[in-house]
């Protein structure tokens, strides 16, 4: 998957595809989760080439950008590790020498681990040569070129390069490998190869001369957009104002220091994977009216930590600094909060409730994907099935954790007692047994507990709730283990 996503950077073929248009409307989360026909490579190109006019609503532009990122990375289908591999592989293809880019393309590398193993073996691309054409050097795939059939001018160029092939490839640097386009197509040269007939088209050639800055997304995409605007009528908006580095994605244009972005590794195991990159990808039809009223003169910019960390239910979305109305929402990878905060005389800002509410139990959530997954607890829908035992799950990540029980994989190890766990959240809870930490406190009696589940069971003592009912008699219990112990007292259960 990572190699497929990075190929749009390395080959530059997707940028010339006809019909690439930005999404015109914001699709619902259910549409995004079920739309498996969208080519991730096309979404990747649309995401990188996205731009919006100055007159457009920055909030709507930010939502479109969020949708494109969601369709490219597909956090509802991929794990955090796979998404990280996609991003790292993309940057690798941008910043590394062309020799290594060819190595990735030839071997079909799927992950960073595979790429690391490939580089450790000191493998180098084969069947590729450096060709000089009209004063520029290109890395070209060999195709049984017969020098006798080539024109004298081209033959002399090829001979000059062939004598220095090994040294030329080894001396390439990341900054020496791109002109205004990362990947260029040579013009036709007649009678150069029998295999290609009278026309020789270097359709996968890589220019190895140019400006080091051309490797960065901004300059490359701006020039690609200018050259392809006539060929691609779907991209009619002005040139994208893309950042020079990933840190500029979260830096405010006023010159303020960028907020600290929470790592994807900090996402809890029970957090829906779709919320890693989707903050507010879309709304239900009932919430669409509220979403359209977000174009206020001043809009809030949420805290960056809300991208990857699940917020407690019922609490307000963190709110950061505001931006001027003329600024486009292009410097953030998450969507804004549901509404701008209302200023009060005392200087405090009102806390807004999470915008997405369940119509069954009225539970509220910070992003729509959490609400979609929560509704499955009411409908009983379990889309993901284990192919070994047939057990079904509501979330893909739950299925992936379950499959570790079959494979025996326990990637998380306690550094104190060396006990291993299948999930990071289990390890986090286990470490409290060594530290003695009890972060969960009962509001009624101030008793503290190590685990959240223990607190919930304890709170039923105060509320009198007994959700576990016996099917053989009217008795009910506050704990599941008490119900199971009671069921053994019935004759039918004992005989079985």
UniProtKB/Swiss-Prot annotation:
Residue ranges annotated as compositionally biased, kind Basic and acidic residues, are: 219-232, 250-259
| Domain SCAN box: residue ranges | 44-126
Polar residues composition bias: residue spans: 293-311
Q: Which CDD domains match?
A: SCAN
Subcellular location per UniProt equals: Nucleus
Q: Which GO CC terms are listed, alphabetically?
A: nucleus
Q: Name one GO biological process term.
A: regulation of transcription by RNA polymerase II
Task: List, alphabetically, the Pfam families matched.
Answer: SCAN, zf-C2H2, zf-met
Q: Which UniProt keyword terms apply here?
A: DNA-binding, Isopeptide bond, Metal-binding, Nucleus, Repeat, Transcription, Transcription regulation, Ubl conjugation, Zinc, Zinc-finger
Sequence position, cross-link Glycyl lysine isopeptide (Lys-Gly) (interchain with G-Cter in SUMO2):
159
* Single GO molecular function: RNA polymerase II cis-regulatory region sequence-specific DNA binding
Superkingdom, taxonomy of origin: Eukaryota
Q: Where are the zinc fingers (C2H2-type)?
A: 356-378, 384-406, 412-434, 440-462, 468-490
Q: Enumerate the PANTHER family for this protein.
A: C2H2-TYPE DOMAIN-CONTAINING PROTEIN (PTHR16515:SF66), PR DOMAIN ZINC FINGER PROTEIN (PTHR16515)
According to UniProt, the name of this protein is Zinc finger and SCAN domain-containing protein 5A
At the highest ranks, the source species' classification is: Eukaryota, Metazoa, Chordata, Craniata, Vertebrata
Gene this protein is translated from: ZSCAN5A
């Amino acid at each position: 998957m990572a190699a497929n996503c990075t190929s749009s950077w390395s080959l530059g073929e997707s940028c010339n595809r006809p019909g690439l248009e930005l999404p015109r409307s914001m699709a619902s989360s259910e549409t995004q989760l079920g739309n498996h026909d969208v080519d991730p490579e096309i979404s990747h190109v649309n995401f990188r080439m996205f731009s919006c006019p100055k007159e457009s609503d920055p909030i709507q532009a930010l939502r479109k950008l969020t949708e494109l990122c969601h369709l490219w990375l597909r956090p509802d289908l991929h794990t955090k590790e796979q998404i990280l591999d996609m991003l790292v592989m993309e940057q690798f293809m941008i910043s590394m020498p062309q020799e290594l880019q060819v190595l990735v393309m030839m071997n079909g590398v799927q992950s960073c681990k595979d790429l690391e193993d490939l580089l450790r073996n000191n493998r180098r691309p084969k069947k590729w040569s450096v060709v000089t054409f009209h004063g520029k050097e290109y890395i070209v795939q060999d195709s049984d070129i017969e020098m006798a059939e080539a024109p004298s001018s081209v033959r002399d160029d090829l001979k000059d390069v062939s004598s220095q092939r090994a040294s030329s490839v080894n001396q390439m640097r990341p900054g020496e490998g791109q002109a205004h386009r990362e990947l260029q197509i040579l013009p036709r040269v007649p009678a150069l190869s029998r295999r290609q007939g009278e026309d020789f088209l270097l359709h996968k050639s890589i220019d190895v001369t140019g400006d080091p800055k051309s490797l960065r997304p901004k300059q490359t995409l701006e020039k690609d957009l200018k050259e392809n605007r006539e060929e691609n009528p779907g991209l009619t908006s002005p040139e994208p104002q893309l950042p020079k580095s990933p840190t500029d994605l979260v830096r405010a244009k006023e010159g303020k220091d960028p907020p600290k972005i929470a790592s994807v590794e900090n996402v809890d195991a029970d957090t829906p994977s779709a919320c890693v990159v989707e903050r507010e990808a879309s709304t239900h039809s009932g919430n669409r009216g509220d979403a359209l009223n977000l174009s206020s003169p001043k809009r809030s910019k949420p805290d960056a930590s809300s991208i990857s960390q699940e917020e407690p239910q019922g609490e307000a979305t963190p709110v950061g600094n505001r931006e001027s109305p003329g600024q486009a929402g292009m410097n953030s990878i998450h969507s804004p909060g549901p509404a701008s905060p209302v200023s009060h005389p005392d200087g405090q800002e009102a806390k807004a409730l999470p915008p997405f509410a369940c119509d069954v139990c009225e539970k509220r959530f910070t992003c729509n994907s959490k609400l979609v997954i929560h509704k499955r607890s009411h409908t009983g829908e379990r889309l993901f099935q284990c192919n070994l035992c047939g057990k079904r799950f509501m979330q893909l990540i739950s299925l992936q954790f379950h499959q570790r029980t079959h494979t025996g994989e326990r990637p998380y190890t306690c550094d104190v007692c060396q006990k291993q766990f299948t999930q990071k959240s289990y390890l986090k809870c286990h470490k409290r047994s060594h530290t003695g930490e009890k972060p969960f406190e009962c509001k009624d009696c101030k008793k503290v507990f190590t685990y959240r589940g223990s607190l919930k069971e304890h709170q039923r003592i105060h509320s009198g709730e007994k959700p576990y009912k016996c099917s053989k008699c009217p008795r009910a219990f506050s704990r599941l283990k008490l119900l199971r112990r009671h069921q053994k007292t019935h004759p039918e259960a004992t005989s079985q």
